[in-house]
Design a protein with these regions (language model features):
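Bacterial N-terminal signal peptides that target proteins for export
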Residues: 1-9
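Short, intrinsically disordered, charge-biased short linear motifs at domain edges
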Residues: 5, 30-33, 73-78
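C-terminal motif of bacterial Sec signal peptides marking the signal peptidase cleavage site
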Residues: 15-18
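Bacterial signal peptide processing site
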Residues: 20-23
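Short, surface-exposed binding/anchoring microloops in extracellular/periplasmic proteins
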Residues: 30-61
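Tryptophan-paired
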Residues: 58-111
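Beta-strand-rich cores of mature extracytoplasmic or soluble domains
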Residues: 98-196
Length: 196
């Protein structure tokens, strides 16, 4: 009986000692992302490369619900006009431009050989400033050299958000892509690897 009472007192003291370390005035290490109001619309794309792009995806930071995708873009035509994909629903993006937002773009390309065909990704892709009240949807523009630019078309006269103007090679919002080793392993040729 005395042993049970002693054990009960020890357990109670341990529990109380654990609570003594909590202080309400200390800052928490948990960071809650700020809530961003999102718009939703079609995602479209243009392909200025000589390769067929089967599909692409756009993803925002975890927990933001920003993302979408599209696909089936023919290669650039002989006259220099880009291959395009029609609108694919639904891309979610911030209603107001977020200067610190960085996105990841992945795309599956057929370069007519086994070594360089497959998934590519560009990380930390920025979207140029846009007017969310005049949105013409999100565009992914694929450029030679495994590069990509994202934009929210808004009729901006400076050309940074105009789909009528091919992004220049010195455009600061163009991101470099690299082969995506993880997705090339998980989804060879765009199909999920079977678990045996």
């Amino acid at each position: 009986m005395k042993t049970n009472r002693f054990i009960g007192v020890v357990v109670l003291l341990v529990l109380l000692a654990g609570c003594a370390g909590l202080h309400a005035d200390e800052s928490s290490t948990v960071e809650i992302p700020k809530r961003i109001e999102l718009s939703s619309g079609d995602s479209r794309s243009m392909n200025y490369t000589p390769w067929y792009i089967h599909k692409f995806s756009i993803s925002g930071p975890k927990g933001t619900r920003i993302g979408g995708g599209g696909g089936n873009m023919r290669a650039m035509r002989e006259d220099g006009s880009p291959g395009q994909s029609g609108g694919q629903c639904c891309m979610r993006y911030p209603m107001e431009w977020q200067p610190d937002l960085r996105l990841t773009v992945r795309w599956l390309v057929d370069k007519k050989n086994e070594k360089t065909s497959g998934w590519y990704k560009a990380e930390n892709v920025r979207i140029p400033q846009y007017d969310g009240s005049r949105s013409g949807g999100v565009w992914a523009i694929f450029l030679p050299g495994d590069r990509v630019k994202l934009m929210v078309a808004d009729g901006n006269a400076n050309g940074r958000n105009s789909v009528a103007v091919r992004p220049g090679d010195d455009d600061p919002d163009v991101a470099q892509g690299v082969p995506d080793e993880e997705w090339n392993y998980e989804y060879p040729k765009g199909v999920m690897r079977r678990i045996k």
